[in-house]
């Protein structure tokens, strides 16, 4: 018990030292650390691929809208039949809400998502000639689309950099001491200031992967984390 108490005290002392050191970081130092984190993540996860199954930008947009508060695996179970029946915005816009609900019924929030899909498809047809727009301002006008979804589309369909702030990106960027903000838009702004645009999409996507595989919401696996030396929240070696 005494030894355990010593280890706990040492752990708290070490973590406190790290926190004090990184709280005194200048913007330049924090930016350097953020870029080092990006490099570590790129080595750990060299291949970037959206796990949502899609064949074109329209299908990616619909799949990302459906992925809110759902697993990618669940979305991938419903989209093949959805896209078989409605491969284009014109078809989806003409479908009944009841039919769309039935096709995506296994997903959370399926009723509200069905309404969003139908309205989004209508907007694509009437406002954008059936094409998915390629600007943030136009994308967030679409039903069911916020900045997170828009940045996924911009980054992966149009190669336009953007920070994708989901629950994993938010949690990890806070644990890494890269932001103290709670609002996703402010987190996006903080991270954007620390990294060059060419890193934005890959960095945030890899943070999401790392959050799913290592840096869990509860009991993060710090001892097998490639970022432990760069993270003020790490308990590795304690």
Describe every region a protein language model picked out:
Residues 22, 27-238:
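Catalytic cores of DNA base-excision repair glycosylases
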């Amino acid at each position: 018990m005494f030894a355990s108490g010593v280890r706990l005290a040492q752990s708290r002392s070490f973590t406190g030292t790290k926190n004090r050191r990184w709280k005194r970081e200048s913007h330049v130092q924090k930016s350097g650390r953020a870029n080092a984190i990006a490099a570590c993540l790129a080595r750990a996860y060299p291949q970037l691929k959206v796990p949502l199954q899609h064949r074109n930008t329209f299908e990616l947009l619909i799949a990302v809208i459906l992925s809110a508060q759902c697993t990618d695996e669940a979305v991938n179970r419903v989209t093949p039949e959805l896209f078989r029946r409605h491969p284009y915005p014109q078809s989806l816009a003409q479908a009944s809400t009841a039919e769309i609900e039935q096709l995506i019924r296994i997903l959370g929030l399926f009723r509200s998502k069905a309404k969003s899909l139908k309205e989004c498809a209508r907007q694509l047809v009437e406002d954008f000639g059936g094409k998915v727009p390629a600007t943030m301002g136009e994308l967030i006008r679409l039903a069911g689309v916020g900045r997170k979804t828009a940045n996924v589309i911009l980054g992966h369909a149009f190669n336009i950099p953007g920070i994708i702030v989901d629950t994993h990106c938010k949690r990890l960027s806070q644990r890494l001491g890269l932001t103290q903000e709670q609002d996703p838009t402010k987190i996006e702004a903080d991270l954007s200031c620390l990294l060059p645009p060419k890193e934005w999409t890959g960095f945030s996507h890899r943070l999401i992967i790392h959050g799913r595989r290592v840096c869990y919401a509860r009991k993060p696996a710090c001892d097998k984390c490639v970022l432990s030396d760069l993270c003020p929240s790490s308990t590795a070696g304690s």
